[in-house]
Amino acid sequence: MKIADKDEFEKQNVFGTGTPNTAYAKYFIGESYLNPLTKPEDGLHLLNVTFEPGCRNNWHIHHAKSGGGQLLICTAGEGWYQEEGKEPVSLTPGKVIVIPAEVKHWHGAKQDSWFSHIATEMPGEECSNEWCEPVTDEEYNKLG
């Protein structure tokens, strides 16, 4: 369900919006927020990531010698996920996306909806992230 109103979104966003994502703001167009659900030292770091309408992260790649990748679990609002060279996937609550290592991709909110997902990096060897170019307005506006 698309949710343009922030107050209404807060009622649906069961894991909470969290605080402004200042640490990674340079890799996002628009405002995003982070609410850590676990700590990195817990063994599995889960974050609830919230995107304001129109917000998306840059293209990026989760590298790993073996294993690795990322898992997204959509929790509120509506968003997009897209792998390079493939059609975008509409994200709604309950949708799970498994992103293998070495796949260039991006994710974020639809133009007219707040959006949240839980994100975690999959276990692997020699894991790292590479942030790439922004998703252009031209690319994004084609999504509808």
Where are these regions (language model features)?
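Short, conserved beta-strand element in jelly-roll/cupin
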Residues: N48-E52, H63-Y81, T120-P123
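A short hydrophobic beta-strand segment most commonly corresponding to one strand
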Residues: V98, D112-W131
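Short acidic-glycine-tyrosine-enriched beta hairpin
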Residues: G85-E102
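Asparagine-centered strand-capping/turn motif at beta-strand->loop junctions
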Residues: G108-K110
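A short, N-terminal "cap"/entry segment at the start of jelly-roll beta-barrel domains
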Residues: M1-H45, S128-G144
